[in-house]
C-alpha cells in the first residue's frame, strides 16, 4: 500500500522494515574481509525483529550473492547495497567523530531506528546523545540491547515521539539545550518524507541550532513527474528477487517521489556552510567500487553542513 502522511508502521512492516533492511546490510558489511564499519549489534537487532529473510541475511545464512542474479537489470544488487550502506554508515560515524573533536558535546539522531551508535561508538566525556523515534522502536531497541548485556557508551537520552508530532518540545523536555552547539544527523530519512515535510524538518533543525552546530543528511534527487513511474519500476525490480526468499514488501511504495528542494542549496540559503559529497566519491573514499550512473542510489549526495 502506498504511503500516506499519517500512516503507521513497526520494524517489520512498511517504512519501518527499511530500518531492519539497513541494519541487515550493516551486518553484512561488518562481516566483510576488510570492513569499512564494525557494528556488532546489527545482527542481533535484526534477528530480534523477526523478519526471517533479513535475519538470514544478517547472520550469513543467506548471502548477497544469493540475491545478485547474473544478468539481472534491477538498479542495484544486494552486494552493492551493502557497500552503499557501509559507506553511508561510515560517513555519519565520521561526522560525529569530527564534531566531537571540534568540541560539540550534544548530538541528535533523527529517526534513529536500529542505529546503535550510542553503544558502539566511542564518545568524549560530557557528551549527551539524543535519539528520536517512535515509542515502540525506542523501547524495542532498548530492551533488546539490554537483553544482550549492552550498555550505552555515553549519556543516551531517548525521545519517544513520531517526527510528525511536536518533537522539538519533547526534545527540550528530555534535556536538549538549543543554546549550545549540536551535531544532527538525518540518516536515510529525507526520502521517506513528503517534500514539504523535508523543508519543515530542515527549518526546525535550523531554529534549534546554535552557532557552531553541524548537520549531516542525505540529499535524494528530485524526481520530475515524467521520471517517477520509471523510478518506481526500478525499485520494484530491486525487490522482486527477494520475494522468492519469502520477503514480500514493495519498497517503491514507501518513498515519496516528486519534486523537492535541493538540500545543499536549501541549507546554503539559510546560512549553513555546506559540503556535498556524491555517493561515488564516498565509496571511493572508503575503498569501495563506485556505482554505475544508472544504479539505484548513485545520485544520492551526502551533505555536511555547519553554521
From Swiss-Prot:
Q: GO molecular function terms here?
A: methyltransferase activity
Keywords of the record: Methyltransferase, S-adenosyl-L-methionine, Transferase
Q: What is this protein called?
A: Putative S-adenosyl-L-methionine-dependent methyltransferase Mflv_5023
Gene Ontology BP term (one): methylation
Describe its function.
Answer: Exhibits S-adenosyl-L-methionine-dependent methyltransferase activity.
Q: What is the lineage of its organism?
A: Bacteria, Bacillati, Actinomycetota, Actinomycetes, Mycobacteriales
Its EC number(s)? 2.1.1.-
Residue sites binding S-adenosyl-L-methionine per the record:
133, 162-163
The family line of this record is:
Belongs to the UPF0677 family.
Amino acid at each position: 500500500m502506498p504511503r500516506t502522511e499519517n500512516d503507521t508502521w513497526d520494524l517489520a512492516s512498511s517504512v519501518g522494515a527499511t530500518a531492519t533492511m539497513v541494519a541487515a546490510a550493516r551486518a553484512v558489511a561488518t562481516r566483510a574481509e576488510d570492513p569499512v564499519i564494525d557494528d556488532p549489534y546489527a545482527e542481533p537487532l535484526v534477528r530480534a525483529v523477526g523478519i526471517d529473510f533479513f535475519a538470514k541475511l544478517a547472520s550469513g545464512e543467506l548471502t548477497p550473492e544469493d540475491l545478485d542474479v547474473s544478468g539481472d537489470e534491477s538498479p542495484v544488487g544486494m552486494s552493492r547495497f551493502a557497500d552503499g550502506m557501509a559507506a553511508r554508515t561510515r560517513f555519519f560515524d565520521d561526522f560525529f567523530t569530527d564534531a566531537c573533536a571540534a568540541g560539540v558535546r550534544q548530538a541528535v539522531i533523527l529517526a534513529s531506528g536500529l542505529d546503535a551508535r550510542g553503544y558502539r561508538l566511542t564518545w568524549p566525556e560530557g557528551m549527551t546523545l539524543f535519539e528520536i523515534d517512535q515509542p515502540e522502536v525506542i523501547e524495542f531497541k532498548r530492551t533488546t540491547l539490554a537483553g544482550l548485556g549492552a550498555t550505552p557508551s555515553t549519556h543516551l537520552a531517548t525521545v519517544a515521539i513520531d517526527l510528525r508530532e511536536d518533537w522539538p518540545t519533547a526534545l527540550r523536555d528530555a534535556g536538549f539545550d538549543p543554546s549550545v552547539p549540536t551535531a544532527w544527523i538525518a540518516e536515510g530519512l529525507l526520502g521517506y518524507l513528503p517534500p514539504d515535510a523535508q523543508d519543515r524538518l530542515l527549518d526546525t533543525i535550523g531554529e534549534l541550532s546554535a552557532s557552531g552546530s553541524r548537520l549531516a543528511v542525505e540529499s535524494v534527487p528530485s524526481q520530475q513527474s515524467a521520471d517517477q513511474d520509471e523510478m518506481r519500476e526500478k525499485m520494484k525490480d530491486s525487490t522482486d528477487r527477494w520475494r522468492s526468499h519469502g520477503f514480500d514488501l514493495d519498497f517503491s511504495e514507501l518513498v515519496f517521489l516528486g519534486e523537492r528542494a535541493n538540500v545543499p542549496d536549501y541549507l546554503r540559503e539559510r546560512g549553513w556552510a555546506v559540503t556535498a559529497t556524491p555517493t561515488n566519491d564516498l565509496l571511493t573514499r572508503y575503498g569501495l567500487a563506485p556505482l554505475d550512473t544508472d544504479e539505484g542510489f548513485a545520485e544520492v549526495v551526502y551533505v555536511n553542513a555547519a553554521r
